[in-house]
Amino acid sequence: MQKIFLLILLVILFPSISLSEDFRFLKIASFSKPWGSSFINNNELIITEKTGKIKIVNINNGKIFEVEHNLKFENIGQGGLLDIVFKNNYLWVSYTEVIKPFNYSTSIARGVFNRKKIKFKNIFQQNSISGSTQHFGSRLVIQDNYLFASIGERGGGMIAQNSKLHPGSIIRIHLDGSIPKDNPKFINEPNWLKEIYQIGLRNPQG
């Protein structure tokens, strides 16, 4: 039976004359395998479900709206629709993309935010595809107008030590997918891919 996860709002009450804290959990809404979320304003979260849906939830009244999209994702193993980030009316989403039958990539797409339908376009695609259905990553973080993304090693172990391949790395790119000129340069590593910020990781999701 498919597991249903609950989105829970943590409300922290700060007593005015005491250092003690009371915690109260409020059930806001139910989702099917939620994976990523990002605030689009003070009252609404946009949420990905691993199974492929993108939804907006109002945290005040619990109302949920589904948003159509054009992503050709694959819900398989640990893969599916993964993380999502909102900034300046744009959305970035990581997902499991089918490159050819039984071969998958961790890919990242960007689209202009729209409440009814979002048209995404890829800005990153993993360069070493695999038939593995595990360890896709993938957490997205925007900082100082750079997009950081963790790419899982797909169960490949030592592939994460290869600076010419994306699995097992963190990439750092501009918000449009281009590669920053100030990305780190590594001595004695002339073939280190310019978008790779760090190697040697397993399946970072935090």
Regions found by a protein language model. Name each.
Residues 105-115, 163-176:
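Beta-propeller blade signature
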Residues 116, 142-148, 173-185:
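Secondary-structure boundary elements
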Residues 19-158, 206:
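Acidic, Gly/Ser/Thr-rich repeat motifs that build Ca2+-stabilized beta-propeller blades
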Residues 4-15:
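Sec-dependent N-terminal signal peptides
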Residues 155, 187-193:
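Short, well-ordered junction/capping motifs at the entry into regular secondary structure
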Residues 192-206:
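Repeat-solenoid scaffold signature
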Residues 18-23, 178-189:
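Blade/loop signatures of beta-propeller domains
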